[in-house]
Amino acid sequence: MGKETVNDLVKFLLPYPGSVKAAALWLREFVWDLYPETNELIYDNYNAVAFGWSPTDKAGDVFCSIAVVSDHVNFGFNRGVDFPDRQKLLIGNGTRYRYFQVRTKEDFPAEYVKELLAMAYENAIGRQKPVKTQIKGQTIVKSISPVKRRPGTIK
């Protein structure tokens, strides 16, 4: 169940440097501790390992996510444009997604992120379509790409 279900994710993170794995797992705990009733959706994609939290089991309802790349982690908000970034710390100029680059705990403005998470979660709940069966507190592996580009592999 949920936060304790970490085996698949740890396996997906094996090719990444220790500091990147540590940041990803610390950020994961950070979100799980704040939103234990949500679901973690994991994607072992071609370019990166990504996982996010959703009040449902649907990717469209994800309110925050972590993307693990070669030398850092992106911690972001799928609809980050929908709420204010008072401190102007979020990166991104697309139509929806905003994020922080995180390399260490010291890089991460945890108290400010808690405010952003609250807004992102409320936004996701407000946009959520009715579901027949509500799934809560689960870790769900949504996809595993058969071919991956990871640190240390030939491009």
Model region roles, listed by residue range:
Residues 1-155:
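Charge-dense, helix-prone N-terminal extensions
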